Design a protein with these regions (language model features):
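Flexible, processing/modification-adjacent segments and terminal tails
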Residues: 21-26, 99-179, 188-196, 248-266, ...
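N-terminal mature ectodomain segment of secretory-pathway/periplasmic proteins
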Residues: 25, 29-118, 146-147
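Gly/Pro-enriched, hydrophobic low-complexity segments
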Residues: 152-247, 421-426, 433-434, 439-457
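Zn-dependent metallo-beta-lactamase
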Residues: 230-299, 397
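Core dinuclear metal-dependent hydrolase active-site scaffold
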Residues: 273-279, 395-432
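Conserved beta-strand hairpin/beta-sheet module of binuclear metal-dependent hydrolase folds
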Residues: 275-321, 420-438
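Active-site metal-binding motif and surrounding structural segment of the metallo-beta-lactamase
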Residues: 301, 312-357, 458-464
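Divalent-metal (often Zn2+) His-rich catalytic cores of metallo-beta-lactamase-fold enzymes
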Residues: 348, 452-487
């Protein structure tokens, strides 16, 4: 028996060695097919998205994981330096004005991956954009003991960076090499607070020699199954002579750049302040810049209006709820809309067993996101997995048990999201809303202008307090709302 075991171990070792040797040949052949370049630059047009920021597209009311339609990027140019290693991409695009404006203004797309960020021992969120490229992937495969397997007509190279996920699990990067030694697809995963083990896939098609460099004609990247980035390549050049100049970081400019790595160090402790709004009714805040929550006590349960974000704030709020209302479960948590700054605390409430109340256009995205495995994460929901539960709001939903009433209304059309709802508490005449903040002394922004006729003329809500999820410097009232609207 011992002899058979030793033989099995020996065969496994031989297979592993053979796989590694085979991988080296596959890598060498693929690098040769791509021109054995030290650097490459390619250009054309591109598109990106505001990720996890469902917009207000009239053609498709269902909120996707991204802002639809995608944002165009003209004069897109990307340099990949395999020696440094480093990458830089730039382009001309547009931005939506700040502060609730819908005005489109010119902007700049800029994505920089430095040699330090591209180090495989550094946070994967900051380096993966380099290693998702065919050239970067092959470099990583050559330097990190890739293995090779056959799958679906491709040779699949697989390797792992040295950096580990929050859970301690290794990240895995796989690249699909076709029979012409071209990279068709590169995929990996990243732990995302809302989307769990988020699958990141980059596909490469239409490979051709652009008269100076082999490059794909089309690049498409998805995250969590949702559109994320696209490039149509019209020119490419291998080993450009001015690599150092092109790779220099751009001057600071406006615009939405590429994804960066997570912050470091422990977050400061959050001090929760409780304001009593009525019997069995409280507002929780952590001060300026907070994402506030309203806690509603019903006869047999608690309803939490907005979960707070990030998870640390949601955790602090849940602890405060248990002090305020001991022995009653948080049965519901209302989500005003599915933007990333309003969903960050939801995993904490899912772990608590709360049902998420959200507009029906948001359910498909949030259900898929929150029920994805979380093996790369180290949060409570990852340690104690629970299935996210939902109650969908169509145009209106009322929660009442004879002691307390909360009314939820879908507000549309508004420019911010197809899945926006507001919460109305009739007894105390409170309107609680996300992203419709008014600034005292200033006219209403485009979001507030859209909300005004819905709340005042269509729904005819009788409210005195106008409370935003985004904590302001001073309390807001209906009078402030009317003044901003010029009524």
């Amino acid at each position: 028996m011992r002899k058979l075991a030793l033989i099995a171990i020996g065969l496994a070792a031989l297979c592993g060695t053979a796989a590694a040797q085979d991988a080296k040949a596959v890598i060498a052949n693929a690098q040769k097919a791509l021109g054995d370049v030290k650097s490459i630059t390619y250009s054309g047009s591109a598109k990106d998205v505001a990720f996890q920021q469902c917009g207000a597209n009239k053609a498709n009311m269902v909120c996707l994981g991204t802002h639809d339609p995608m944002r165009p990027i003209d004069n897109y140019v990307r340099l990949i330096d395999l020696t440094a290693p480093a990458s830089r991409a730039t382009g001309a695009t547009n931005n939506i004005g700040p502060g609730g404006s819908t005005t489109i203004t010119p902007g700049t797309f800029s994505q920089q991956i430095t040699a330090q960020q591209a180090d495989v021992s550094q946070p994967w969120a900051g380096s993966l954009e380099f290693y998702l490229t065919p050239w970067g992937f092959l470099k990583g495969a050559a330097e990190n003991n890739a293995t090779a397997t056959k799958r679906s007509g491709h040779t699949v190279l697989t390797w792992s960076p040295s950096v580990k996920a929050a859970s301690g699990k290794s990240y895995v990067v796989s690249g699909y090499v076709d029979d012409k030694n071209m990279i068709d697809r590169v995929e990996t995963q990243l732990g995302d607070n809302v989307m769990g083990d988020m699958q990141i896939v980059a596909t490469y098609s239409g490979w051709k020699d652009f008269g100076g460099g082999m490059a794909p004609s089309k690049i498409v990247q998805t995250r969590g199954g949702w559109p994320f980035f696209e490039v149509t390549v019209t020119a490419a050049k291998a080993n450009p002579p001015d690599v150092a100049t092109i790779a220099m970081p751009p001057a600071p400019a406006g615009g939405r750049g590429g994804p960066g790595g997570p912050g470091r160090g422990p977050a400061p402790a959050l001090m929760v302040t409780t304001e009593k709004l009525g019997d069995g009714l409280w507002k929780l805040t952590t001060g300026a810049g907070s994402y506030d929550s309203i806690i509603v006590e019903f006869k047999d349960y608690v309803m939490m209006l907005e979960a707070g974000q990030p998870q640390a704030r949601a955790t602090a709020y849940v602890a405060e709820v248990k002090k305020l209302v001991p022995n009653k479960p948080i049965r519901y948590v209302w989500n005003s809309h599915p933007h990333s700054d309003h969903t960050g605390g939801l995993p904490v409430l899912v772990e608590e067993g709360a049902t998420i109340v959200t507009q029906k256009n948001n359910v498909a995205f949030l259900e898929k996101a929150l029920n994805t495995p979380r093996t790369l994460l180290d949060d409570p929901l990852a340690k104690t997995p629970k299935k996210a539960k939902f109650e969908a709001v169509d145009e209106k939903k009322v929660y009442s048990d004879g002691t307390r009433t909360v009314e939820i209304y879908h507000v549309a059309p508004v420019p911010h999201s197809n899945g926006l709802t507001i919460a109305y508490i009739p007894k105390e005449k409170i309107l609680f809303q996300g992203d419709f903040t008014v600034t005292p002394g200033e006219p209403a922004n485009d979001h507030v202008k859209a909300l005004g006729p819905i709340v005042l003329d269509k729904l005819k809500l009788d409210f005195d307090k106008y409370i935003p999820v985004h904590a302001g410097n001073a309390p807001q009232t209906k009078a402030d709302f009317l003044k901003a609207l010029g009524r």
